[in-house]
Every structure is written in C-alpha cells, then in structure tokens.
Design a protein with these regions (language model features):
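Glycine-rich phosphate/diphosphate-binding loop of Rossmann-like nucleotide-binding domains
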Residues: 6-9, 21, 25-27, 32, ...
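Phosphate/nucleotide-donor binding subsite
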Residues: 44-89
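A glycine- and small-aliphatic-rich helix-loop capping segment at beta-alpha/alpha-beta transitions
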Residues: 13-17, 100, 104-121, 188-193, ...
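N-terminal glycine-rich anion-binding loop in soluble enzyme alpha/beta folds
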Residues: 4-61
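Short beta-strand segments
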Residues: 28-29, 51-53, 94-96, 123-124, ...
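Short glycine/serine/threonine-rich phosphate/pyrophosphate-binding segments
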Residues: 4-11, 35, 74-84, 91-105, ...
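Glycine-rich phosphate/nucleotide-binding loop
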Residues: 106-120, 126-130, 134, 214-218, ...
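A short helix-to-beta-strand connector/capping loop
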Residues: 45-51, 197-199, 284-285
C-alpha cells in the first residue's frame, strides 16, 4: 500500500478496477485500518471478489533495496510478491519504492530460463492514436548485447499478446539509422537480432522516432531508456500546461479555446500520461507491475489493468516459450 499519496488513492483505483474489470479478483495487502472503510463501501457481490491481507510493515520511499529485502519481510510489498510466487495471485501491482520492488521481485521470483536480467517496460503514445513499447526503463543501468537481444524478444511477446499486434516491429534505439552509427554494444545487438528470424527486427531508430516511427517495440539499455521516458513525461506535461495557459491569457484565447474544446480534449486523451502508467518488470517467473508513486487513482487503474491483461494472456509463459524456441535457433 505504498505510494506518495498513501492507501486512499490505491483503494480508489481498486474500486474503479473492480467496476471496469468484471472478472478481476483482488487481494489487497496493507494495514487493516485502511481497508475497513473501503470494504464497507462495496456492495455484497463485489466484496466477494476482494481478499485482504493485513501487513504490519511498510517499505518507505527512502528505504534502500537491501534494507527492504533483508529487514522488511512482513511488508505489504514483500507479501504481494510472495503471493505471486505461491500462485495465490497471478500478478501484483505496487506504487512503492522502485528499487526495493525490483530487488524483492528479482530475489523471490527469479528470472525465466534463458533470461539474464529482467527489464522495465511501458507503453508510450505514438502518432495516429497508436502506442509503442519502450524497454529497458531502468531495471539494469548496464547491459550487454545479449541482454538487449533478450529485451527485444520479451518486448515482442508483450506487444503481440497484450495488444494483439501480429509480428510486432522491433527496433534498437541509436544515434542514427546508418549501420556505421552506434557503439559496440548496439552494433553487436543489431547483429544478434538480424540473425534471429523469430523477431521482426527493422533496425535502428533515433530518439524522435520512438513517438512517430514504424516500430512497435523500441529497445535500449536502462540508463538511456529511463532518460528517454522521463524526458517524454516532462514534454507531455509541458505541452499540456502550455495549452492550458495559452487558453486563459486573453479573452480571444478563451473564446477560441471553447470552440476548440472537443479537439483539445481529444489531444489531451492521447497524450495524458495517466493512461500509460504501469511499467512491467518482465523476464521474471511472475507478473510485477510498477505504478508511479505519485499516480492518481485513474493512473493506478491503468497499472492494474496492465497487470490484469498480462495475467489473462499468460505473458511469462509466452516469454518462456519464445525464449526456448529462440535458443534452439542459436
């Protein structure tokens, strides 16, 4: 029950999720005091779809990953991941400390066979109302070519299973499209992907093409991916704020904004970061989704929806099968 805004926002998201996803069964881990009012507000039928596990420890945003892993074994974060491992739940969502979540998930769940390190992956908006998957977003700052290759395979599976994209187009993020561009890491990964017929690899893309190019999946190391993600979020906020400011500065602007309101709402819906909340830690033997710590209830709903869709499509099993077939090719 972590997050910057406390359990209230997460419980609102839980209620929304139960209303919008009729097959969803929820297990909520946290302090019993937070759950009491939430349970009272549910109708009898919905209440049967919710279980609660009382946890007397919390991983704070300032806890070091090692502290959370070794000393907070009764925390809500540890409990939800333990439930995934035991099979009592099919997926978990947390708004808590990212480093702690990754450390606990990696330690408890372990990686799938053939996967050296998990990766954080998330959807981002693209032109014409489409979406693109970007990974790694910071799970591993340093990565080798084999790691990038594994990310490409996992991203391809997620795009195919959760967005039903047939043969998703996969690209490597680089400083140019030409073969001579890039460092040794990217060039080696490029060759590995060119030699893999199981991945629909289309070559390099530059930073601006993440949001406008042909790729359905863009692969990079965690250091670069995290910067790209945070930059895109900052630009989205800037655009939204500038549009709001421009529409209230003068009487004419206010009048014009009313005429353009349907168009502005449509634009906002496309770039609103809330609907892209929820970064999946893929490559593990279980589903773990990280929600932004400062996410709204609506944004948290999308993180829950992401976890639900991955569970519904058995994404870890599909990644395992794909990796096994790729290893046989090599």
């Amino acid at each position: 029950m972590g997050g910057d805004h406390g359990p209230h926002v997460l419980l609102l998201a839980a209620r929304n999720s139960l209303q919008k996803l009729p097959k969803l069964q929820l297990t909520i881990c946290g302090h019993a005091s937070a759950y009491a009012q939430f349970s009272d507000d549910l109708d009898v039928k919905t209440r049967l779809r919710v279980d609660f596990v009382d946890c007397d420890e919390v991983v704070t945003m300032t806890d070091k990953p090692t502290t959370a892993l070794r000393k907070k074994k009764r925390s809500s974060m540890r409990k939800v991941i333990d439930l995934v491992k035991s099979g009592d739940v099919q997926a978990c969502v947390s708004s808590g400390n990212t480093g702690a979540l990754m450390a606990i998930a990696y330690y408890v769940l372990k990686t799938l066979p053939g996967i050296s390190r998990p990766a954080l992956i998330s959807w981002l908006p693209k032109g014409q109302g489409k979406k693109v998957l970007l990974l790694d977003l910071g799970a591993s700052v340093n990565c080798d070519a084999e790691g990038l290759f594994q990310y490409a395979v996992m991203g391809s599976v997620l795009a195919e299973q959760c967005s039903h994209i047939h043969e998703p187009k996969v690209a490597l993020l680089n400083v140019g499209q030409e073969d001579i561009k890039g460092n040794t890491l990217v060039k080696h990964a490029d060759q590995l992907l060119r030699d893999c017929p199981s991945v629909n690899y289309i070559g390099y893309v530059e930073g601006d093409e993440i949001f406008s190019g042909d790729a359905d999946v863009v692969v990079t190391d965690g250091f670069t991916g995290n910067i790209a993600l945070k930059s895109s979020e900052g630009i989205a906020k800037l655009v939204i704020n500038e549009i709001k400011q421009a529409t209230i500065e003068t009487f004419f602007a206010r009048l014009l904004s009313k005429l353009a309101l349907p168009l502005l709402k449509k634009l906002y819906q496309r770039i609103n970061p809330d609907q892209y909340n929820g970064a999946s830690l893929i490559g593990l033997r279980g589903i773990v989704v990280k929600s932004h710590g400062n996410a709204s209830a609506e944004a948290c709903y999308y993180a829950i929806k992401q976890a639900y869709e991955e569970a519904e499509n058995a994404v870890p099993d599909k990644i395992k099968t794909k990796i096994e077939s790729v290893l046989m090719e090599h």
